[in-house]
Amino acid sequence: MKKIALFITASLIAGNALAAQTYIRNGNIYTHEGQWAAEVGAFGSTDLLKDQDKSYGALLNFGYHGEDFNADLSGLNYRFFGNTGDIVNLGTYLTGSGVAYDQDSANSVKGMDKRKATVDLGLNADIALGDGTVSTYFQHDILNENKGYKTGVNYFHIIDLGVADLVPFAGISYQSSDYNNYYFGVKDKEATAQRKAYHAGGDFSYNLGYKLVYPINDRWEITQTSAYTRLGSDIAHSPIVDSANQWLVGATVAYHF
């Protein structure tokens, strides 16, 4: 895994009186409402596929985060019911989904057909509970790549540390059989002596993690995210999946304007 340089420590020692302006909207962690953002960073993770070619990469994002409408490289979302401060907010969104790979992505998928990422259309409900938010969602493939859906619930809790905001989160998600079998199943024609044919059914996965948001000034901020996902057995038992335990660590620098 590629090592990621985290340079938060020195800044924290110097001290900072700025507020991080963190909030939850349409199931996402945002800062600086009503501004544009440009973000760059890197991530490292455990291998999802056995003998995966690489498990690190760049994190790039650019977009606008408004009061109701948000658009960036991760997708589009719009709050169509409720206002900031209301107990219930409802939204709709478009987002990229799936695990794109081909036979060059890992030794375990040599000779298999290419799997493509897709775009999902979804509905989201945010329920405010003090400094916490329960966020539920349902999304379905609209490009007919995997023909499946995902649904789940996450809990976010914003903790003001004075110099930074810490947002722990936890959730449970369900991936349909069509989704799981497209990405983690092995067709009869793809089976080999080392890779048996496999049908993946629908299953639950669980996640736990945090995001730390540290403002350098009113324009610049540093974020650091760590997350753990426990894959359901229908995914984990696939002959091409490396482990049920998946970790991800990332860090970014963002500029708001």
From Swiss-Prot:
Q: Record's family? A: Belongs to the MipA/OmpV family.
An annotated GO cellular component of this protein is: cell outer membrane
What name is this protein filed under? Outer membrane protein OmpV
UniProt KW Mitochondrion keyword: no
Q: Which InterPro entries match?
A: MipA, OmpV
Write the record's keywords in alphabetical order, separated by commas: Cell outer membrane, Membrane, Signal
Give start-end of the signal peptide.
1-19
Looking at the keywords, is Signal present?
yes
NCBIfam families on file: OmpVVibrio
Q: Where in the cell is it found?
A: Cell outer membrane
Q: Name one Pfam family in it.
A: MipA
GO BP, one annotated term = peptidoglycan biosynthetic process
What organism is recorded for this protein?
Vibrio cholerae serotype O1 (strain ATCC 39315 / El Tor Inaba N16961)
